[in-house]
């Protein structure tokens, strides 16, 4: 099943994010078997990071929660809120990316 994992940064976490970026990226590479797509969210026209959005393909909500909890950004407190929502694949157009 697909789940959207929407992570919003806590306030004032730029340095915290930077210091945990390498392990975060390593973690995502290790999750490529379930990670459909993901990336940082930012304010258009600026470099201001707002959080991250991931689509994961896992068997259960608990597995989506485990994905989120295993992320070094989550463990370090980079994210102020994480919302996990089940979703259906309605349109799939990877060539549009």
Predicted regions and their residues:
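Conserved, structured core segments of small domains
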Residues: 1-97
């Amino acid at each position: 099943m697909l789940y959207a994992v929407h992570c919003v940064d806590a306030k004032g976490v730029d340095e915290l994010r930077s210091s945990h970026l390498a392990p975060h990226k390593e973690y995502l590479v290790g999750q490529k078997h379930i990670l459909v797509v993901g990336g940082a969210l930012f304010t258009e026209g600026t470099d201001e990071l707002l959080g991250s959005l991931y689509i994961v393909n896992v068997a259960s909500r608990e597995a989506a929660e485990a994905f989120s909890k295993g992320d070094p950004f989550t463990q370090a407190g980079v994210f102020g809120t994480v919302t996990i929502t089940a979703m259906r694949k309605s349109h799939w157009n990877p060539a549009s990316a």
